[in-house]
Amino acid sequence: MEEMALAQQVPNLGLARFSVQDKSILITGATGSLGRVAARALADAGARLTLAGGNSAGLAELVNGAGIDDAAVVTCRPDSLADAQQMVEAALGRYGRLDGVLVASGSNHVAPITEMAVEDFDAVMDANVRGAWLVCRAAGRVLLEQGQGGSVVLVSSVRGGLGNAAGYSAYCPSKAGTDLLAKTLAAEWGGHGIRVNALAPTVFRSAVTEWMFTDDPKGRATREAMLARIPLRRFAEPEDFVGALIYLLSDASSFYTGQVMYLDGGYTAC
């Protein structure tokens, strides 16, 4: 009897801590490279998903191709508070609650600062900072009202902490803003058991970075320079981020908040 009582008091320290089974998770930017992989992985792990994105055809392809036709789908980007609220309400309408959020939506525009249009700068800041802020505002109200904690993950970049000579005067500051938004909300919501972290990858293959993987001289030069600084001597694939995502959205990371998790093959170690 004493052994049984002791066993009941000891918390589960195995793989059950990493479970996202039946958690209601909202993914914005679900049709992007990272969003698609996250959706498939979380669905395989038993999460209940709400997928948001501006590409209706891409959402349909994701849902059908990944076999997650029970997901709630919202065709919009977080361009306004109404859009963000629509995403959150879709999760509540389908599952009755919200447990986690992955903000994988974002944008970039590469140009020297002397040639970049103000409108292009604004578009990057709106997509990467304002959009994340809007989603956090809408989701945070629900998480606070539920009173049962939760986890929010903002997709950032190693460029949030590093400059770049290749025309990133909009992107780098926007990702620094993403990092500080995560830290600020972690401090603001910590007393309510809501964790907020940023996930900061280096370059990985996607529609945005495809130019780097061509035989174009600029692409080849950029690729070789990047690889020379990555100790693992390879670029990431979206699948490399699955383990970190599941960790951050599961109870395994219950004491991890306000952090920028670098997934960069050692890039920032050099």
UniProtKB/Swiss-Prot annotation:
Can you name one GO molecular function term for this protein? oxidoreductase activity
EC number per UniProt: 1.-.-.-
Q: Where is the active site?
A: 171
Residues bound to NADP(+): 30-55
- Provide one Gene Ontology cellular component: cytosol
Q: Name one Pfam family in it.
A: adh_short_C2
Q: Which positions does UniProt annotate for substrate binding? A: 157
Name the top EC class.
oxidoreductase
Q: Which UniProt keywords apply?
A: Oxidoreductase
Q: Which PANTHER family match?
A: SHORT-CHAIN DEHYDROGENASES/REDUCTASES FAMILY MEMBER (PTHR42760)
Miscellaneous note of the record: Was identified as a high-confidence drug target.
Family assignment from sequence similarity: Belongs to the short-chain dehydrogenases/reductases (SDR) family.
Protein name per Swiss-Prot or TrEMBL:
Uncharacterized oxidoreductase Rv1714
Origin species, per record, is Mycobacterium tuberculosis (strain ATCC 25618 / H37Rv)
